[in-house]
C-alpha cells in the first residue's frame, strides 16, 4: 500500500504537461465538426473521436520521448539535424500552422465574448491579445525553478476544468434514453464506408483533433522537469539530460500524457457530439452550423442556460487553447531559427499575426467571414500535419539520436546525427553505459502507417472540399 502511495505522490509531480497538450485537442475548431457529426449520425461517429485520440496519443508519446531523450524539442532537433534549407522550409510550414491554429482560438474566444458579454466581434478579437500577458508573467521553461511553470500549468488547468464542467452540465441537461446506443457509438461502424458524408465528417474530426502545433509543444514542455532533476542532483543543467533524469521522468510523463488525453480531450470532444446527437439529431439547420448557430440551436432545442454554458465552455477552451498556441509559436520560432528576440516579443508577434486577418475579416465581412476563416484554418492544418510530423518519426527512429551514453550519470552524446565522437567521449570508452531508446521496429512501422493514413485521408478531404463536396471542418 505504501509503495502505491509513493507512486501516486511521484505521479502528482508530473501532472501538468499532459493537460497543456490536451488543450490542443479541444479547441473551438473541433466544435462545429462534432456538432455536425452528432446532428447527422447521432452517436455513431464517437468511434472517429476515439480512434483520432489513439493516433494523437501515439504521436504525442513520440514527442515526449524525443524531448526527454535528446533534451531538445522537435523544432530544435530540426535545426540541429536537418539541412538548413529543409529546416527553413519546415519552419515556414510550422509557422503557418501556428497562425492557422491561432485563428480558430481567436474566432472562438471572440464569439464567446459576443454571446456572454455582448462585446462586438471586432473588440472581442482585440481582447484575445490578453492571454499573451498571462504567458509573459508565468511561463519560463528555461528557468531553473519549476514554481512559475507549475503556476502556469495550474492556471491553464483551471480553464480546462472549467471547460469540462461546462460539458458535464450540458450532458445533465439532455436526455439519453438508450445508453446502449451511446456506448455502441465507440465501436467501429460500416456507415463510415457506406455514406460519403459520414466519411467526410469522420475525416474532419480527425483533422480537427490531431493538431500540428501540439507536436512542438509536447516535445518542449517535458524539459523543465528534466532540468529540475539534474539541477537538484548534479547542481547544473546540460543541454542533454542525465540518464537518471530520463529514467526518473519518462514513464511518468507517458502515463500523465495518456491519462490527460483520454480523460480531458476524449471526454470534451465526445460530450460535444453526444449533446448534439441527443438534441439536434435530424435537425437540418444543425448539419452545417457555425459556432454562433450552435449556440442558437442549443438555446432553442434545450434551454437558454444550455446555450450560455456552451458559450462559457467556448470561452474557456478558446482562452486556454490560445495561450497554448502562442506558447507553441515561441517554441517554433526559437527552435527552428534560434531567435535572439526577447520571449515577450516572439509571443506578441505570433498573436498579432493571427489577430490581424481576423480583425480585417470581421470589419469587412462580419459573422459570415468569421465562419469562413475558421473553415479555411482547418483546411490549412489538415494539409500541414503530415509535413511537420514526418521529422518526429525520423528522429525517434534514428539510433544516433536516441542512444544515450552514460558515464557517472551524465550524458555525453553527440548533439546531432552528424557529430563525430573524439577520443575523450564515452562513445569510445569501454566503461560507458549504453542505453538505446530508439523506436522498436513495430513502433516505427506503426508510426509510419498512422502518419501515412492521416496524411492521405487529410489530402483526400481537402481535395474533395476544393472540388465542391459538402464537407464540415
From Swiss-Prot:
Sites carrying a glycan are 87
Q: How does it sit in the membrane?
A: Multi-pass membrane protein
Secretion signal span: none
Q: Where in the cell is it found?
A: Vacuole membrane; Endoplasmic reticulum membrane
Question: Where do the TM regions start and end?
Answer: 14-34, 44-64, 97-117, 119-139, 152-172, 198-218, 257-277, 297-317, 352-372, 373-393, 448-468
Q: Give one GO biological process term.
A: intracellular manganese ion homeostasis
Enumerate the UniProt keywords alphabetically. Endoplasmic reticulum, Glycoprotein, Ion transport, Iron, Iron transport, Membrane, Metal-binding, Transmembrane, Transmembrane helix, Transport, Vacuole
Could you cite one Gene Ontology molecular function of this protein? Answer: manganese ion transmembrane transporter activity
- Pull one GO CC term from this UniProt entry: endoplasmic reticulum membrane
Keyword Protease attached: no
Q: Name one Pfam family in it.
A: Nramp
Task: Indicate where this protein is primarily found.
Answer: membrane
InterPro entries per UniProt: NRAMP_fam (IPR001046)
Instruction: Identify its protein family.
Output: Belongs to the NRAMP family.
What does the protein in this record do? Answer: Has a role in controlling the cellular iron ion levels. Mobilizes vacuolar stores of iron in conditions of low iron levels.
Give the matching PANTHER family.
Answer: IRON TRANSPORTER SMF3, SOLUTE CARRIER PROTEIN FAMILY 11 MEMBER
Q: What is this protein called?
A: Iron transporter SMF3
Q: What organism is this sequence from?
A: Saccharomyces cerevisiae (strain ATCC 204508 / S288c) (Baker's yeast)
Q: What is the lineage of its organism?
A: Eukaryota, Fungi, Dikarya, Ascomycota, Saccharomycotina
Amino acid at each position: 500500500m505504501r509503495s502505491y502511495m509513493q507512486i501516486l505522490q511521484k505521479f502528482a509531480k508530473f501532472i501538468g504537461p499532459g493537460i497543456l497538450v490536451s488543450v490542443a485537442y479541444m479547441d473551438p475548431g473541433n466544435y462545429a465538426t462534432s456538432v455536425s457529426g452528432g446532428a447527422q449520425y447521432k452517436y455513431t461517429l464517437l468511434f472517429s473521436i476515439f480512434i483520432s485520440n489513439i493516433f494523437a496519443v501515439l504521436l504525442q508519446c513520440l514527442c515526449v520521448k524525443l524531448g526527454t531523450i535528446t533534451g531538445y524539442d522537435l523544432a530544435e532537433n530540426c535545426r540541429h539535424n536537418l539541412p538548413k534549407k529543409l529546416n527553413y522550409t519546415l519552419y515556414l510550414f510550422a509557422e503557418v500552422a501556428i497562425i492557422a491554429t491561432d485563428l480558430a482560438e481567436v474566432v472562438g474566444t471572440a464569439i464567446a465574448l459576443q454571446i456572454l458579454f455582448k462585446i462586438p466581434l471586432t473588440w472581442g478579437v482585440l481582447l484575445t491579445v490578453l492571454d499573451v500577458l498571462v504567458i509573459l508573467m508565468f511561463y519560463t521553461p528555461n528557468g531553473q525553478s519549476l514554481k512559475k511553470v507549475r503556476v502556469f500549468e495550474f492556471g491553464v488547468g483551471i480553464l480546462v476544468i472549467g471547460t469540462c464542467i461546462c460539458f458535464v452540465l450540458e450532458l445533465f441537461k439532455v436526455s439519453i434514453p438508450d445508453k446502449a446506443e451511446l456506448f455502441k457509438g465507440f465501436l467501429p461502424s460500416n456507415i463510415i464506408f457506406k455514406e460519403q458524408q459520414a466519411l467526410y465528417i469522420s475525416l474532419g474530426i480527425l483533422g480537427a483533433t490531431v493538431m500540428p502545433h501540439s507536436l512542438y509543444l509536447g516535445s518542449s514542455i517535458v524539459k523543465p522537469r528534466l532540468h529540475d532533476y539534474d539541477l537538484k542532483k548534479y547542481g547544473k543543467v546540460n543541454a542533454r539530460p542525465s540518464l537518471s533524469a530520463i529514467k526518473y521522468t519518462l514513464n511518468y510523463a507517458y502515463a500523465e500524457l495518456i491519462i490527460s488525453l483520454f480523460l480531458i480531450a476524449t471526454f470534451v470532444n465526445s460530450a460535444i457530439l453526444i449533446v448534439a446527437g441527443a438534441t439536434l439529431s435530424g435537425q437540418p439547420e444543425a448539419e452545417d452550423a457555425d459556432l454562433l448557430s450552435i449556440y442558437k440551436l442549443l438555446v432553442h432545442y434545450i434551454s437558454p442556460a444550455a446555450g450560455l454554458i456552451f458559450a462559457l465552455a467556448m470561452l474557456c477552451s478558446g482562452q486556454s487553447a490560445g495561450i497554448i498556441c502562442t506558447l507553441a509559436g515561441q517554441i517554433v520560432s526559437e527552435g527552428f531559427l534560434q531567435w535572439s528576440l526577447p520571449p515577450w516579443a516572439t509571443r506578441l508577434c505570433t498573436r498579432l499575426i493571427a489577430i490581424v486577418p481576423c480583425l480585417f475579416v470581421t470589419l469587412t465581412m462580419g459573422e459570415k467571414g468569421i465562419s469562413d476563416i475558421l473553415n479555411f484554418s482547418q483546411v490549412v492544418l489538415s494539409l500541414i500535419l503530415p509535413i511537420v510530423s514526418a521529422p518526429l518519426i525520423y528522429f525517434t527512429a534514428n539510433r544516433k539520436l536516441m542512444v544515450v551514453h552514460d558515464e557517472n550519470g551524465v550524458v555525453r552524446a553527440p548533439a546531432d546525427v552528424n557529430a563525430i565522437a573524439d577520443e575523450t567521449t564515452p562513445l569510445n570508452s569501454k566503461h560507458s553505459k549504453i542505453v538505446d531508446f530508439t523506436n522498436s521496429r513495430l513502433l516505427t512501422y506503426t508510426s509510419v502507417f498512422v502518419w501515412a493514413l492521416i496524411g492521405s485521408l487529410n489530402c483526400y478531404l481537402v481535395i474533395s472540399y476544393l472540388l465542391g463536396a459538402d464537407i464540415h471542418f
